[in-house]
Amino acid sequence: MGGGFEKGGNVATFAEVAVDRKSGEVKVARLVTAFECGAIVNPDGLRNQLEGANIMALGGALFEAIEFANGQILNGRFSDYRLPRFSDVPVLETVMIDRKDIPSAGAGESSLVGVAPAIANAIFDATGVRLRSLPLVPNGLKVA
């Protein structure tokens, strides 16, 4: 049996949000992701993978939640489960750091790990409200 190894990527994410203090609506205006995974073999594929992961993470960060009552799932259909819509997708900026000096590594959905913390920190910066559980604003943000 051969030996295993792991080489992952490095990611940093920045979020810019707009908060309507009257309605409590939070809108992510921009997501910037910088990603390094060694030598980039397929730049278009990598960009698509990163942008898709960021949109997926946007839903989990803001409003995706399974609702329960008495041990039963209340929103078991996609018509009752809030997913990101085209109108939710912010401006996406992707910075791919191509390191020809090191071997390629897998990307997968690695970029999704930074999205929720970046959005939570942007909401805190805008409002002073620190949110610590996901989804961050399933029913709007309560701001004094």
Label for each model-derived stretch:
Residues 2-144:
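C-terminal catalytic domains of large/alpha subunits in multi-subunit enzymes
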